[in-house]
């Protein structure tokens, strides 16, 4: 038996095959029988389990949603953080150190009109409390609903090469001059608002069926997951802390995913940027991976808005593979942008002038494969100043199979302007703007009367009283750039840290000032309406209207910077004696009296004796203010001379290389450009004066009609009566018939 057990069978052994096959078949038969027995048992138990499952399902919430990849919404997202890449070889541009000048003149040391020791004690106590406040802020930030058009400005600016600086400055003036203009909101002399309404027939002829619009607005999505978005996009949204889409997003995203053209209107802060960026990223998930091409172009009126949109797209698409964004805006390095556009990024965010410049002069940049065109802030893009640039861009962009998305805070343009955009049966989505302020906003009004000269001292007294430790974000709105700059100097000499934001600053200065304000390095930001448009920084506690706006809508836009997402906020307005100022106050009070809003509108009591004492200090520093302005002007001239000297030396060193470069071209000659500007000014002015909206509208209608309309003369009326004598005797169809009766 031992020998038989030790016997090793060969491959040719028949016994091995027979024994192995019999055993395997037996095992298979046994396993099959066991499975059949299990199935029989299961089939018998099925009716009982069905009854139990039905009882359990009654307790299950049908609206339950699983957490995506186990990622919870972040609670530490503090606004948009955008950064601009910088080459290691680049040297930062020199700017005038205004703070250094103010320190040499005795400013930025201690607050005027207060005891320095008391201020130091207050600062020590505030530092201890601030550590606790920072922890509480991190916990509370998850409760804040940040507007999707907000952004952080943590950017280091790209710097222009010295030999290219003057050329690029000329191009910026030519292509993006619109970014540096601070224009006031136009209001008619009679207080009438411009209202370009189209007939119902024309709108029905141009827009898609109203049923689509109604169905789009009626769809209410409680979460982004019900929008049937892909997992990478949902993951990016969850990382940003966004779970519930806003009304404009809920209505426009499904339509945009179908490839339809959209004309959408919603107020600033409603999430317009994500409303078009989410469907764009969703569409780019299915792009051909082998061929790199620019498929999306987003047009914005300002540089800051373009940089913000780029950061929003990067944050939402951070988990999408091979998704690239490019930037084409003025004020940044032109050569570096050309290198970036050579890689043909999927999405290019641009201002109109710089985009035309790159299309005409950058050899490797092509838009032949463009699929989606987005026009953000369309109300400004369709103004007379941008009309020529838009026409040129639309003539260069392919029309076939192109989806056009048009978004705006206000939409009062004519049908003919939209037809020029080559929209094909667009779906019209208009979300009604709020005509009242936030519920937890306290609106305070200070009646200035005939004390306009005390406004700088009044502003300093309020800032010192409201925020003695300078730990709150305060935005001060002014109407002019000169006022913003002078206020910064005055408050700086009085010992207060202040920054400014307006069109006269360079791009690097703008970004640095907003970044310092966001990080509370500088707690007060003085800005104009145009510079602050589209800018949304979280947790602004106080808004001060140093100069009242021109309309109630602009007033709501200003005070809407604070009291967001159920937080408390305060707005303080310096009200003058003009009719427009009083009307704004009346409208604000009326909105509260209607019972729709629970906010408060109060008159703030001011210690005018203290303000007059502070005004004496301000007046005593008038000579120092003039010295600061002169020194700043001289420093700017020195920097300009140094730049010209560096450029001349570079021209001598690299003369052949610079002359070998092809000359950059523009679609308009200087003669045509001046002609267009004069035509625009003629439409806006008459005999050197501003024309109100009613008269300007009549001028436009007359221009469109192409001349004076024909009116019947007396001879024509007599001949008509002779042809139709019954009209003379009949029902009094003519005035002559009535007289004869």
Swiss-Prot record:
UniProt subcellular location: Nucleus, Nucleolus
PROSITE patterns according to UniProt: DEAD_ATP_HELICASE, HELICASE_ATP_BIND_1, HELICASE_CTER, Q_MOTIF
Pfam families, alphabetized: DEAD (PF00270), Helicase_C (PF00271)
Enzyme Commission designation: 3.6.4.13
Catalysed reactions listed for this entry: ATP + H2O = ADP + phosphate + H(+)
Motif (DEAD box): 376-379
Comp. bias regions, Basic and acidic residues: 652-672, 698-723
Residue ranges annotated as motif Q motif: 222-250
Listed name of the protein: ATP-dependent RNA helicase DRS1
Organism name: Scheffersomyces stipitis (strain ATCC 58785 / CBS 6054 / NBRC 10063 / NRRL Y-11545)
GN (gene name): DRS1
